[in-house]
From Swiss-Prot:
GO biological process: 1,6-anhydro-N-acetyl-beta-muramic acid catabolic process; amino sugar metabolic process; peptidoglycan turnover
Name of this chain's protein: Anhydro-N-acetylmuramic acid kinase
Binding site for ATP: G13, T14, S15, M16, D17, G18, A19, D20
Lineage top rank: taxon: Bacteria
Family matches, as InterPro entries: Anhydro_N_Ac-Mur_kinase, ATPase_NBD
Entry keyword set: ATP-binding, Carbohydrate metabolism, Kinase, Nucleotide-binding, Transferase
Magnesium found in the keyword field: no
Pathway assignment: Amino-sugar metabolism; 1,6-anhydro-N-acetylmuramate degradation; Cell wall biogenesis; peptidoglycan recycling
């Protein structure tokens, strides 16, 4: 009888707060469960350098390569901590899937840039490494994002009803899982990104812990309406987005400077919730259950905004109710994609990205 296999997934999202590593167990292409997690926060200096690369500037090529190496050393450290916590050796792991750190996402030009020195990561970890997952989908005419709907479908689909899965990272994205049709999904718009940027600019804090600052503010209806008028929200899916559209300087074009900082933050929370509600109402009108993952689930103000928007129409749940910690989901997805690569299984959600066909995502690097 063939033994089961262990994989590690490493993910650092658009919130740029750090790197998550998750250990999963597979039986060939069959998911058996997630078994461990490690997290390494980004030092402030690293985060600032990554944010600086979001905009064009001098010496970009050199800076991006140096940051790729720095990130890969941090990723290797995170993987080592995970192995240590599980009493495992690198030789126990079949493959490691690494997403890298997105610094540019331009599907209209058929490219998306995730920083990671994958050969260095393979060398540092002594584990076969799979990465650069988005490029293959882009080559087939897709958006390169979101990639997680195929993983959500493999784990969370129900044969009796349509489910929605909401990931709230820097960008929010939904996966729609019909019982009798392929999964699809798309980016709904900003998740935590604008709230985090506002916190950094006005409180010098990386995020609004427990929604404490937003809870002190009031929604500004006129500002909310102006934000919701962005043409991205009227575009049909498949679609994806990032900081290129929804950066702090975009928000500031709608402000006169006299707004209370707490009120703006409160409005940004409702903005995220409203765009999610509008997307689900349009694309998954028959969904009655929505399972939530990502960092946004820890913000009670945002969760209350979602509950108010959806009312009794859709029940909101954590993915923990489906046996996967909401903080582990994205990293687990890239471990699963590494397993798909090893087993030559197409892992791309082409109905979500708009690619012409299902693809085996990623490129592999031996140590």
């Amino acid at each position: 009888m063939m033994e089961t296999q262990l994989y590690i997934g490493i993910m650092s999202g658009t919130s740029m707060d750090g790197a998550d590593a998750v250990l999963i167990r597979m039986d060939g292409g069959k998911w058996l469960g997630a078994e461990g997690h490690a997290f390494t926060p980004y030092p402030g200096r690293l985060r600032r350098k990554l944010l600086d690369l979001q905009d064009t500037g001098a010496d970009e090529l050199h800076r991006s390569r140096m940051l790729s190496q720095e990130l890969s050393r941090l990723y290797a450290q995170t993987a080592a901590e995970l192995l240590c916590s599980q009493n495992l050796a690198p030789s126990d792991i079949t493959a490691l899937g690494c997403h890298g750190q997105t610094v540019r996402h331009a599907p209209e030009h058929s490219y998306s840039v995730q920083l990671a020195d994958l050969p260095l990561l393979a060398e540092r970890t002594q584990i076969f490494t799979v990465g650069d997952f988005r490029s293959r989908d882009l080559a087939a005419g897709g958006q390169g994002a979101p990639l997680v709907p195929a993983f959500h479908e493999a784990l969370f689909r129900d044969d009796r009803e349509t489910r929605a899965v909401l990931n709230i990272g820097g960008i929010a994205n939904i996966s729609v899982l019909p019982p009798d049709a392929p999964a699809f999904g798309f980016d709904t718009g900003p998740g935590n990104m604008l709230m985090d940027a506002w916190m950094q600019a006005h409180w010098q804090l990386p995020y609004d812990k427990n929604g404490a600052k937003a809870a002190q503010g009031n929604i500004l209806p006129q500002l909310l309406d102006r934000l919701l008028a962005h043409p991205y929200f009227a575009q049909p899916h498949p679609k994806s987005t990032g900081r290129e559209l929804f950066a702090l300087n975009w928000l500031e074009t709608y402000l006169d400077g006299g707004e209370n900082r707490y009120d703006v933050l409160r409005t940004l929370s409702r903005f995220t919730a409203q765009t999610v509600f509008d997307a689900v109402s349009h694309a998954a009108a028959d969904a009655r259950q929505m399972y939530i993952c990502g960092g946004g689930i820890r913000n009670p103000v945002l969760m209350a905004d979602l509950a108010e928007c959806f009312g009794t129409r859709v029940s909101l749940h954590s993915t923990a109710e489906l046996n996967l910690d909401p903080q582990w989901v994205e990293a687990a997805a890239f471990a699963w994609m590494a397993a798909c690569w090893v087993n030559r299984i197409p892992g791309s959600p082409h109905k979500a990205t708009g690619a012409s066909k299902p693809c085996i995502l990623g490129a592999g690097y031996y140590y």
